Amino acid sequence: MVTGTIKNKVDKIWTDIWAGGITNPLTVIEQLTYLMFIRSLDEKELATEDFENMAGEKMEHIFPASAAGQSMRWSRFKDKDSREIFLTMQQRVFPAIKKMKYGRLPDFDANGELVEIADDPTRPDEGNTAFARYMDDAMFLIPTPQVLQKIITGLEDLYTHDIADLDMQGDLYEYMLGKLATAGQNGQFRTPKHIRDMMVELVQPTPDDFICDPACGTAGFLVSSAQYLRAHYEDSMTPEQWQHFAGPMFTGFDTDRTMLRISAMNLMLHSITNPEIDYKDSVSKQNSICSKYTVCLANPPFKGTVDAESINDDLKAVTNTKKTELLFLALFLRMLKTGGRCACIVPDGVLFGSSKAHQSIRKELIENHQLRAVISMPSGVFKPYAGVSTAVLVFTKTGAGGTDRVWFYDMKADGFSLDDKRTEVKENDIPDIIARFHNLDAETDRKRTEQSFFVPKEEIAANGYDLSINKYKETEYVPVEYPSTTEILADLHELEMEITKGLAELEEMV
C-alpha cells in the first residue's frame, strides 16, 4: 500500500522534475522509469555477487569488470558530485543501457568509446528483459546536474526507507502512473485500477492461461491479472507455472514505444521479467495472430480510426469499418482460442449504433459466440481523463453460438465520486456485480425494474441486436398527486395578501 509519506516523497520528486523544466507527465514517468531500471540492474548485480561469495561459483555479470564498467553502477555514482553523476549518466550509463545485450552492458575502451557486445548466433537474446529491448530510441532528458541529483536522492530515500519489497515497488509505480491525466491522440487513456480488477475478477484467469491485451498502454490489465493470480494461486503454483508466469503468460501490444517501455517496467516491478511486449498495430495486416490466447482484457482506443488499406482483411470481413472500437472486438474473437474469455470496455455507441458495421459485430457476438454480460458504467468512471459513457462486455469465443440470454447490470456507483475529483465514497456496486455475475442462476427471476436482469437472445435480435440497457430496462413510475387548481389559486391569493400587507407596513414606516 502506498502511504501518505510515500505519496509526499513521490510528489516532491515530481515537483523537482517540473521545476527543472520537464512538464509533460509522460516524459516525467519515462525519465523516472530509466532511473528505476538503472538502479534495478545494480541490485541484480549485488545479488549475483552475494551468490558468488556464498556458493563459490562464477556467475555472468551485468556490469563490465573495468573501472568504466563499474562506474555505471548506481551504488558507485549515487553519492558523487552532481556534475560527475550527470556526466556518468550522460556519457556512460545511458549509452550503455541502450546497447544492452544478452543481459549484459557493453564496456568502454581507453578513449571512452563504447564497445558494443558482439552478436552470438548460437545464443538467443534471452538475457534481456522486455524493457531493455525497447531502450534503443530512448532519450535522456533530465536537464541539469542539480535536478538529476535531487531525483536520485529522492529515489534512494524511497528505496532505502519505504520500499520493502517488489510489491511495494509495483504499488509505487502504479501511483506514478496515476499522474498520467491526459488521453493520447488515439483516444487511449488509463483504466482505473478498481475497474481493471473488476474485469479480471469477471474472467477469473488461472495459472495456465495465456493473457493478452492488444492495446496495452501501461500494461494495467496484465498487472491486475498477475496480482489476481498471486492472490488466488501463489501457494499452489508449480515451478513450471511460475516460469510461465514470468514471461510467456502475458502479452501486450502497443504502437507507442514509450508506452512499451513503461508497460515493460510496470510488469518487471510485478515479477514478470520477460513478457511478450511488442510494437504492433493490432488491427493492421502486420498482426495475423489467430486462436492463441485464452484470455483477452482490454480498453481499446475509442476515438481512433485507422487507414483502411492497413486494416487486416479478417477483421473487415466481420465488421467493415475504420472505427477502432469495432475492429478490436473482431480482433479479440480472432486472437482467442475456442473457449477463451474476454472482458473489454466499449463506448456506449458500440451498444446501439445503427450502422451496418455496428450491427454486424453485435450480431457476430450474439449469434456465433456467447455474449454473457453487458455492464453499463456511469460516465464519470474515466474522469478526469474523459467523460464518455462506457460499458464492459464479457463474452466467450465458441464459434458455435451459445448466447441464449444476456445479463445486463446498471452500475450506478464504483466507490468514487463521479466528478473530476473522484474522491472515495461508500456507494460501490462492484462487489455486487462480481457476486451476481458468478451466480447467474439466481438472476433468472429478476424483474426489468431491478439493477440487473436477463434479456433473451430473441428479443435482442428483434431490436437490431441493440445492447443498451435502457432499451430493455423498465422504470416504475410512482404516481405523484398535485394540489388542485383551486387550491393553488387560493394559496397564491393568500401569498398576495401577505405581500400587500407587508408593503403597507413598510410604507407606514417611511
What are these regions (language model features)?
Residues 39-45, 180, 219, 229, ...:
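A generic secondary-structure signal for well-formed alpha-helical elements
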Residues 188-298, 303-307, 314, 322, ...:
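Conserved S-adenosyl-L-methionine
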Residues 1-202, 206-207, 275-287, 376-380, ...:
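Non-catalytic, mostly N-terminal accessory regions of nucleic-acid modification and defense proteins
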Residues 268, 301, 337, 341, ...:
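Hydrophobic alpha-helix feature that most strongly marks membrane-spanning transmembrane helices
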Residues 23, 307-324, 348-357, 378-385, ...:
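Short, contiguous acidic/charged loop-to-helix segments that flank catalytic cores in large enzymes
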Residues 246, 292, 296, 388-389, ...:
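A generic structural signal for well-ordered coil/turn residues at beta-strand boundaries
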Residues 28, 255-262, 322-395:
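Conserved Class I SAM-dependent methyltransferase catalytic core
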Residues 370-371, 383-433:
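C-terminal, active-site-flanking charged/polar segments
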